[in-house]
Amino acid sequence: MKVVVVGDGAVGKTCMIICYTKDEFPETYTPTVFDAHKGNMDYNGKEVSLHVWDTAGQEDLARLRPLAYPNANCFLVCFSLVDRESLKSAYTNWRNELITLGPGNCPKILVGLKSDLREEFMKDENKRAQCVTREEGMKAKEDYTF
């Protein structure tokens, strides 16, 4: 099964993928150009092999991203829970890109990342306004049709 992960740069896509496929937590941030990882999951009692394609969120690499889209079985559209703009971008930028360039009837799942940083951000008055609230996340789940 081919899973393609998209979203703005630095929202946590690569970290999520490495945690899932290698059971490791990367301590440093390295922007991704393009990478592919393998993992397995149990689905209805059957082991399924996942091929997870990690794409660059940076605009200057936008021409490379669509190379990962053909034959995708699923897209994970990622945003950071500590960056409200990345949630808006999930709908305005990533939704439009997948509608235009992605396979038509492919499921798209909205994924909030960096939940481990929310508590720290909520304590800081300057950073608090950047956080996506639970209510906003639930509303996005209902409103953001892909």
Task: Please annotate each region the language model reported.
Residues 1-6, 10, 15-23, 27, ...:
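Ras-like small GTPase catalytic G-domain
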Residues 33:
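ATP-binding glycine-rich phosphate-binding loop
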